[in-house]
Amino acid sequence: MGALNSLPDEPQYVGLAEKTGFSFEQIGILHKRFKQLSNNGETLRREDFNTIPDLLCNPIRSQIIEAFFDRRNFRQTDAVGTVHEIGFGEFLVVMSHFRPPSIRLDDEQKEVIRMEKLRFLFNMHDTDNDGTITLEEYRHVVEELLSRSGALGKETAKGIADAAMLEVASISMGHMEPDEFYEGITFEHFNKLLKEFEIESRMNIRFMNMDTTTLCK
């Protein structure tokens, strides 16, 4: 699965750096974290993430863990389904979705990164890969993004998220016929709903005391 036998040498770093945007130094740091999580093994399984204290109380803990084993997040063309274990390459690619964008990017590059992060967020909640997420899942996304801004308390963020969910429900279902079934929020709708959110700097997680907000050039 692309696992690396030892600390990646420079030629391997080049490919990984180009694919993920991480610097050689950052890749080295993440490789050490990978080895710690895998008990110095070559692959990671879902159970290896159960030892991470910062994930234990996260309300979307299961979705975060599952995201590491979702082929859609490996930046491979038309990849679907899940895997039982991942190597360092896959781990690094998924981690790059949580990496804040470089301040040196132009507007077009920033938009590409924003869309990648939105797709990653959507995939995280679209667990059955049917192209839609539920209103409740959308509420979770909004609450998480607001909570991570640091400007709002947890209860305030929850209240705003509840209101956002109800607003989407009223708009979506208000245009439906009585016999129609609400199929959920598509990615296109999801993108429009979150257009006012600055998700680029709010998607971060901690792994064994390593904050991904520090992993920017």
Residue locations for each model-derived region?
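EF-hand and EF-hand-like helix-loop-helix modules
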Residues: 49, 64-73, 90-92, 102-128, ...
